[in-house]
A protein has these predicted regions:
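Active-site nucleotide/adenylate-binding loops and adjacent lid/helix of ATP-dependent enzymes
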Residues: 2-10, 20-22, 57, 81-85, ...
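ATP-binding N-terminal substructure of ATP-dependent carboxylate-amine bond-forming enzymes
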Residues: 1-89, 93-94, 103
């Protein structure tokens, strides 16, 4: 029996989604692209179920393409696939972690990866103190959440 792959994507016509579909089919997967926001779930002691347009979905593997705007509900769908035993390329925890820049930096540091001095601030006043603490330029200033370089600024001096 051919393995069943679900690609979770809000954009089935996106180039990257189409290429994933083409390549997975070339390797013998039965591939479905499903909008994660069109999925319903049932959670129970037996692992639960996932439905799309009223029909149960079975997947051996899942490739989530969860955009920032649907991080929370999308990661819930991904977690349900995990609970049902599917191999998931990007786990729900990894998706959530990738959206939180401070937590991601903490995990990298805990794993022994070199990270730049990073300061998280709660207010503009704290930001000025952080600038004095770091003490040298250039600095990169980022919003605590976001993707693809949104709200990232380079401060030269």
């Amino acid at each position: 029996m051919d393995p069943r792959l679900v690609i979770l994507s809000r954009g089935p016509g996106l180039y990257s989604t189409m290429r994933l579909t083409e390549e997975s089919q070339r390797y013998g997967f039965i591939t479905r692209v499903i909008d994660p926001m069109s999925i319903s779930t049932t959670v129970d002691d037996d692992g639960g179920r996932i439905y799309h347009q009223g029909w149960p979905i079975q997947a051996d593997a899942v490739i989530p393409r969860i955009g920032f705007s649907i991080t929370r509900p999308g990661s819930g769908i991904v977690r349900q696939f995990e609970r049902m035993g599917a191999i998931v390329h990007n786990t729900a925890d990894a998706i959530l972690l990738s959206r939180d820049k401070i937590a991601a930096t903490q995990v990298m540091a805990d794993c022994g990866l070199p990270v730049p001095k990073t300061i998280s601030v709660a207010s503009m006043e704290d930001c000025m103190q952080a600038l004095r603490t770091i003490g040298s330029y250039p600095l990169v200033i980022k919003a605590s959440e976001g993707t693809q370089g949104a709200s990232v600024f380079l401060l030269d001096d």
